[in-house]
UniProtKB/Swiss-Prot annotation:
GO cellular component, one term: cytoplasm
Coiled coil: none
Domain of life: Eukaryota
Gene (name only): WDR6
UniProt organism field: Bos taurus (Bovine)
Functional note: Together with methyltransferase FTSJ1, methylates the 2'-O-ribose of nucleotides at position 34 of the tRNA anticodon loop of substrate tRNAs. Required for the correct positioning of the substrate tRNA for methylation. Required to suppress amino acid starvation-induced autophagy. Enhances the STK11/LKB1-induced cell growth suppression activity.
Biological process per Gene Ontology, one example term: wobble position ribose methylation
The name this protein goes by in its record: tRNA (34-2'-O)-methyltransferase regulator WDR6
Subcellular location: Cytoplasm
Length: 1124
């Protein structure tokens, strides 16, 4: 551990933070957002949208910003210059800003004033500022000099949970304090006869049964709103609070939140509340819920602001997201459910089915065989035709397209299908396709060129009809093109179909949950070279499309994914962007693609919680995707991007006839209820006119951070070049992304919210872009491991981008393996696109159920958690990498990845530690003229480290590989090569670095200590081997040092950067650098970061001009950089 050169002390600077948004304030046409100690400034552009203007870093030091107060100007002009007080915790700072003409300049900044108590509210009073402190006192402060002018306490020196200051002068200043006794205390600081003499409360207001977290006063109407822990919002009639002795009356008690209410704001016509349930509710002053905004994830909405003139509501959440919502009248017009009044004496029969032809025409059929049309422009019902052959049992489907192409199809229980032109129903065409019941109908449309109708009959036969129109447009031609045969099942009919571009294939879903691939034209099979894979069976006589017509061959599927969506069936198939999206009643939707005429699953995703019936997928105008489905008795349109329920219709559930249509002009949903047709229609289509000012990261704590690699983008990717500093005027703002492409680091984070997120972190802009999220886990994700990092196309044909294999693991002993491919894409703001392919998954309890010898095994506790992962890449050809997992049940398990990650199986295990294993770390040892040795280090809650030699276990004749081939009991690793008692309690961080002497090993513990030692690997001489047997290497500790009080809390991150430098991170929120090489590690310097409860850290070198980067994950994400 000798240092050969003096090391320059690194100075870490914060480059990026993604923390809960705790403060929001609208100032004229600008928005101020507080994120940690930083301020984000947004400005309103000419298009009426907010855009990012500036980030002011570290304004409040080590305090979190909880609020802003703007000093009112005599002329009311806040568009050019403004004086802002930012406060939070015990800190206060005043800053004067110039932001006119789109340029941001900081003119003056006061010192950071530290108060003696928590600041709950602040208010400007004639150049000074009044502060309401945490134990029911008020301080009048001079922000320029930085001194207290007056300090007046209340006689009730209780702890406050909130406070509100009212008034413009010291004489009329009123304090409304929310005490821990659940009361509101109203008192007047100016009533104090002398300074520091307590003031008796003027009024005490009771009503809530929990502490009060927020309050808002509307002076024009004399109303006060309070939000409480009891999940309610109360409205009080208080009159002018600046006048003592007034009467307080509770005029509203609003229940609508399912958890604690954090924030409340009173407007002239609305009351806005937001809480721990991640819902923002808009109320009338009478207590009626007018709107509900859902989209944030995690533990709630922490900040709330409103812009009355623009009719905006802005929310900031624990998920680091900022969202802008439109109030009623500006946001979501034309929505609502209304009955179409079908019941009439002139329309006999009972409605059996309903469908939509576009978004403004409704079709319905009765049990009398009558087909009716309702035009939303004419607003009346019209009978198109009546056919007694379609009474009792009748199917109805309208052709897809903006206005349904003016076609619909009927089918009955006798094998008859009728294709009806809606505008000329007398030109309907009848066909008898089957000798029995038609089970289902579906349409398949290829642009405006080809339209097919598929009908399922008895025996799994699907007739494919080609529909074309006459040149006059008044007649249609229907021709049976071919027949398909479904795989055998109990309920043997198809449920949906779609063309796969460019149109050579049809993708179908069936009732047993399978996804099938058929040729759209059987005569194309010869050109595709897949004739031998598809069987053709001649149909039985009499099963043709008409009397005397020749029988058609029934073509089997080219590719099948059996029971992909379980036993409830596939509900929709959609093709977009080269992928196939399927949905089902198993509560999931799949992304598939076709390669070589075969269907291959890419990714399985789940929509919002509780949507067990996923009905469809739609691509909207902005390029995003929305999911349709049923959540209990409600039909829901859900956005995966914003995690928001865009539309909610209480229809009674999906076990009824319903139809959905979406165009850019409007969205429509029709369903049958109480013998009538109900229609929900919303102008503007599926989308909602709200703005995501900043994307969410994770809804819960980040548990692991792992850097994958880096990508360099240039002008060919549509990214502008670097701007030289002399091209910018002093103080000119730099747009995010305009600093140039530079280097972009790809980082993977996982969280307690069960998601794995892929982030792009540009080195030049100090921003973060969420590329994609993987939501396959059913419980929290605790660890991520990466291997096989490369470029698209492989070494032979490298292309711009990055590819990698990823393994994620966490709660419920669940592990998933997938690949990511990040490629340049000029469309999104990140200039990158990320494609994910799920390869395999593994759960210990499911693995146990499949074993033949499970009676000889102890069933694994289903609550077992994987705490840490390590990938051991092998040099043996034909054998995939090993994944080592630290398990909470005291075991260390080794999994073998085969077939490029598509097979994941348990290979070996050991229960040496007999207690929860917290960390695993793999490293290799290479000696001259010797084989490469693979070692694994594991650490447990007793502070011990165990070292295992995995090389011998992976030999050609190893019993571990024989057990893997036999899929029997996992191989037992036995005893470790070396055990080191490094700490007195759990080891939360572990890292190694190869040196000339062996390996430098460092660990950090829950007691805040560090342990560093040199591990020597002694290889036996070749002459010592007798009879060709290989002698095992000997491990021993050469030097060993400990730092007992390196941190004040758990050390959760540790990285040996070089032989002379180490960096550690702890829950005490300090990033500390240590000098190695001179005995005990020596403290160099420390930087305070703002992420609370840090769970993991990753560091990597970037380049000589950018130095090192370090990502810290906990309750948020923060990225630091330093230069060597």
């Amino acid at each position: 551990m000798d240092a050969h050169e003096d090391y320059v002390w690194p100075r870490a600077t914060s480059e990026l933070i993604l923390l809960p948004v705790t403060g929001l304030e609208c100032v004229g046409e600008r928005l101020l957002a507080g994120e940690g100690p930083d301020v984000l400034v947004y400005t309103l552009d000419f298009g009426g949208h907010l855009r990012m203007m500036k980030r002011v870093q570290n304004l409040l030091g080590h305090y979190l910003i909880h609020g802003f107060r703007v000093r009112p100007e005599p002329n009311g002009d806040l568009d050019s210059e403004v004086m802002v007080a930012a406060f939070g915790s015990k800190g206060l700072r005043i800053v004067k800003i110039s932001w006119g003409q789109g340029r941001f300049r900081e003119l003056w900044r006061s010192g950071l004033w530290n108060m003696s108590d928590w600041i709950w509210d602040a208010r400007w009073l004639e150049g000074n500022i009044a502060l309401a402190l945490g134990h029911n006192s008020v301080v009048l402060y001079d922000p320029v000099v930085g001194c207290s002018l007056q300090d007046v306490p209340c006689t009730d020196r209780c702890t406050l949970s909130s406070a509100c200051l009212i008034g413009d002068t010291w004489k009329e200043l009123t304090v409304v304090a929310g005490a821990v006794s659940n009361q509101l205390l109203v008192w007047y600081p100016a009533a104090a006869l002398t300074d520091d003499k307590p003031v008796v409360p003027d009024r005490r207001v009771s009503g809530h049964v929990g502490v009060i977290f927020s309050m808002s006063y509307l002076e024009s109407k004399g109303l006060l709103a309070t939000a409480s822990e009891d999940r309610s919002v109360r409205i009080w009639k208080v009159g002018d609070l600046r006048v003592p002795g007034g009467r307080v009356q509770n005029i509203g008690h609003c229940f609508g939140h399912s958890a604690r209410v954090w924030q409340v704001k009173l407007l002239e016509n609305y009351l806005i509340s937001a809480g721990e349930d991640c819902v923002c509710l808009v109320w009338s002053h009478e207590g009626e819920i007018l709107q509900a905004f859902r989209g944030h994830q995690g533990r709630g909405i922490r900040a709330l602001a409103a812009h009355e003139r623009q009719a905006w509501v802005i929310t900031g959440g624990d998920d680091s997201g900022i969202r802008l919502w439109h109030l009623v009248g500006r946001g979501h017009p034309g929505s609502g459910v209304f009955a179409l009044s079908f019941k009439s004496h002139s329309r006999p029969g009972v409605l059996k089915a309903v469908t939509l032809a576009g978004s403004w025409r409704v079709l319905a059929v009765t049990d009398a065989g009558a087909l009716y049309l309702y035009d939303l422009e004419v607003k009346c019902w019209e009978q198109l035709l009546e056919d007694k052959r379609f009474q009792s049992y009748c199917l109805l489907e309208a052709a897809p397209g903006p206005e349904g192409f003016g076609l619909c199809a009927l089918a009955n229980g006798e094998g008859r299908v009728k294709v009806v032109p809606i505008n000329t129903p007398t030109a309907a065409v009848d066909l008898t396709l089957f000798p029995g019941k038609v089970h289902s109908l579906s349409w398949a449309l290829r642009g405006y060129e080809e339209l097919l109708l598929l009908a399922s009959g008895p025996g799994g036969v699907v007739a494919c009809l080609e529909i074309s129109a006459a040149p006059s447009g008044k007649a249609i031609f229907v021709k049976e093109r071919c027949r398909y045969l479904l795989p055998p099942s109990k309920q043997r009919w198809h449920t949906c179909s779609a063309f796969l571009p460019p149109g050579d294939f049809l993708v179908c879903g069936d009732r047993r949950g399978s996804v099938l691939l058929y040729p759209s034209r059987p005569d194309l099979l010869k050109d595709l070279g897949v004739v031998s894979k598809v069987g053709a069976i001649t149909s039985a006589p009499g099963a043709g499309s008409g009397e005397g017509e020749p029988s058609l061959a029934e073509w089997g599927p080219m590719s099948t994914l059996p029971s992909l969506h379980g036993k409830q069936g596939v509900t929709s198939v959609t093709c977009h962007g080269g992928y196939v999206y399927t949905t089902g009643r198993d509560g999931s939707y799949y992304q598939l693609f076709v390669r070589g005429g075969q269907l291959q699953p890419v990714l399985r995703q789940k929509p919002c919680r509780g949507m067990n019936w996923v009905a469809g997928v739609r691509m909207v105008a902005d390029g995003n995707m929305v999911i349709l489905g049923f959540h209990a008795n409600e039909f829901v349109v859900w956005s995966p991007r914003s995690h928001e329920k865009l539309h909610i219709i209480n229809c009674g559930g999906g076990h009824r006839s319903w139809a959905f249509s979406d165009t850019e002009a409007a969205m429509a949903f029709a369903y049958l209820k109480d013998g009538d047709v109900m229609l929900y229609r919303a102008l503007g289509g599926c989308t909602r006119p709200h703005v995501i000012l900043r994307e969410s990261l994770h809804g819960r704590e980040i548990t692991c951070v792992k850097r994958v690699g880096s990508i360099t983008l240039g002008p060919e990717s549509g990214v502008p070049s670097f701007l030289q500093p002399d091209h910018l005027e002093p103080g000119e703002p730099v747009e995010p992304g305009s600093e140039g492409p530079g280097l972009i680091d790809i980082v993977i984070t996982c969280s307690e919210d069960t998601t794995v997120c892929v982030l792009a972190l540009p080195t030049a802009t100090g921003s973060a872009h969420a590329l994609t999220a993987v939501c396959n886990h059913i419980s929290s994700v605790r660890a991520v491991a990466v291997w096989g990092v490369g470029t698209p196309g492989g070494p032979q044909d490298p292309q711009p981008g990055l590819t990698a294999h990823v393994v994620s693991a966490g709660g419920r002993a669940e592990m998933h393996c997938f690949t990511i491919m990040v490629t340049p894409d000029p469309s999104p703001p990140s200039r990158l696109a990320c494609h994910v392919m799920h390869l395999s998954s593994h759960r210990l309890d499911e693995y146990w159920d499949r074993q033949r010898h499970r009676h000889r095994m102890i069933k694994v506790d289903p609550e077992t958690r994987y705490m840490s992962l390590a990938v051991c890449e092998l040099d043996r050809p034909g054998l995939g990498p090993l994944v080592a997992a630290a398990c909470s049940d005291g075991a260390v398990r080794l999994f073998l990845l085969q077939d490029s990650g598509r097979r994941l199986q348990l290979l070996a295990e050991t229960s040496h530690h007999k207690r929860c294993v917290l960390k695993v770390h793999a490293f290799t040892h290479e000696a001259p003229n010797r084989r490469r040795r693979l070692f694994l280090c594991s650490a447990a809650t007793d502070g011990s480290l165990a070292f295992w030699d995995l090389t011998t276990m992976l030999d050609q004749d190893s019993p571990a590989l024989e057990a893997a081939a036999d899929l029997g009991l996992p191989f037992q690793l036995g005893s470790p090569c070396l055990t080191v008692q490094a700490h007195s309690c759990g080891v939360n961080s572990l890292h190694t670095l190869p040196t000339r002497e062996g390996h430098l090993v460092a660990s950090g513990s829950e007691d805040g200590s560090l342990h560093v030692f040199v591990l020597a690997v002694e290889m036996p001489e070749l002459e010592e081997a007798v009879g060709g047997a290989e002698l095992l290497p000997q491990l021993q500790v050469l030097e060993e040092y400990s730092v007992p009080c390196a941190h004040a809390a758990h050390v959760t991150g540790l990285k040996i950067l070089s032989r002379s430098l180490m960096v550690s991170a702890s829950i005490d929120q300090r990033l500390t650098f240590w000098r190695l090489g001179h005995g005990e590690p020596t403290f160099m310097n420390s930087t305070v970061y703002h992420v609370a409860d840090v769970a993991d850290m990753d560091c990597w070198p970037v380049s000589p001009e950018f130095g090192h980067r370090c990502a810290l994950g906990g309750q948020g994400l923060e990225v630091y950089n330093w230069y060597d």
